[in-house]
Structure formats: C-alpha cells, structure tokens
Regions:
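A short beta-loop-alpha structural element at the N-terminal edge
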Residues: 7-21
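Hydrophobic adenine-recognition pocket in adenosine-nucleotide-binding enzymes
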Residues: 13, 97-99
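Active-site rim helix/loop that mediates acceptor-substrate recognition in acyltransferases
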Residues: 31-57, 63-84
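Conserved acyl-donor/pantetheine-binding loop and adjacent beta-alpha core of acyl/acetyltransferases
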Residues: 63-97, 104, 154-159
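Conserved catalytic-core motifs of GNAT/GCN5-like acyltransferases
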Residues: 69-71, 131, 141, 146-162
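Residue-level recognition of the GNAT/N-acetyltransferase active site
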Residues: 100, 133
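Conserved acetyl-CoA pyrophosphate-binding loop and the N-cap/start of the following alpha-helix
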Residues: 103-115
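Conserved GNAT acetyl-CoA-binding A-motif
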Residues: 113, 120-132
Length: 167
C-alpha cells in the first residue's frame, strides 16, 4: 500500500490509549530504558496533551511525549514523577520518540516532532529539550536541536546527550 493510500491521524493521548502506548514503547526501547504501563498511566493523567500520537489506518505506529517545566535541563527525576509537570512551564521536555520498527524511515517521528515544536511555539514556550544517544544527534539537529554535551542522566545506564531547540 502506498503512503498516499494510508490514513494518517495525529492527536493527543487519552487514558484509552494507555495499553497501545505502553506496547509501542516496549517494542522501541530495552526494558532498562522503557517507561512502564504504570508510568504511562501517570503521565497521561498529568499531561496527555503533551503526547503526540500518530495513527496509520487506526493503528498507533509512532508517538512523542514529555512534560512541561520551568527547569531548563531534563533530569531523570522527571521520567519518574509525572506530578512535576507544570502546564505553564517554559520548556517542553521530550522523553521519548517512538516508532515501531516496521514503520521506521517513513518520516513519522519527524512529523510528530514538527507538531510538538509547533505546539510548543504556539504555547509560548522558550523551546524544547530532549536527551538522546550519540548516534541520533545528527537526526535531531535536522530539526534545529543543538547538542549541549553529555547529560547528567544515567537513565538505563547509558550515555545521553542533551539537545535543545530555542525559539
């Protein structure tokens, strides 16, 4: 099926999306890095409007999520404590950029990042912050994110680089 024939829908998350969001996360990240169903339950309850879900023919294939805060740097504590979300915060944090393996390299994650960037700008944020592994630095740079160096994060016991997009 050609992409033109596929019905693509981008929307925010509701609690009804909990199980499919957790399933996609489990398919995309190792257990040591993946958020749990319980963590997603808290995140969706606190900031479901800061989840961007992409459905292809009614199947969730990609999502981006993260809280908003006045803190300038993304910390490991943010992953674990959804209640730290500040709806009027200055920075949109991006915790995860997920696309199921069979749907990668079709631009889905990029569409969601562009939507998250547009929404953050429209909401008057200072910008967005994410952490990534070194191999993904050039990918995020294409969207205007600047590498700020090694993050203090020890999430999943790997080295993360903090990247920031300022408006």
């Amino acid at each position: 099926m050609m992409e033109a024939d596929k019905k693509l829908v981008i929307r925010n998350a509701t609690m009804e999306d909990l199980f499919v969001v957790a399933a996609v996360e489990a398919e995309c990240f190792p257990v040591s890095e993946a958020a749990t169903e319980a963590e997603f339950r808290e995140r969706i309850a606190c900031y479901g409007g800061h989840f961007w879900l992409l459905f292809e023919d009614e199947r969730l294939v990609s999502f981006v999520d993260g809280m908003v805060t006045d803190q300038e740097d993304l910390t490991d504590e943010m992953y674990e404590r959804a209640e730290l979300h500040q709806e009027a915060g200055e920075w949109q944090m991006i915790f995860g950029v997920n696309t199921i393996p069979s749907c990668r390299h079709q631009g889905y994650a990029g569409r969601l990042l562009q939507q998250a960037i547009a929404d953050a700008k429209e909401q008057g944020r200072k910008g967005l912050v994410l952490t990534c592994k070194d191999a993904l630095i050039p990918y995020y740079a294409k969207f205007g994110f600047v590498n700020e160096g090694v993050s203090e994060s020890v999430h999943g016991n790997v080295v993360w680089y903090q990247m920031r997009l300022r408006f």
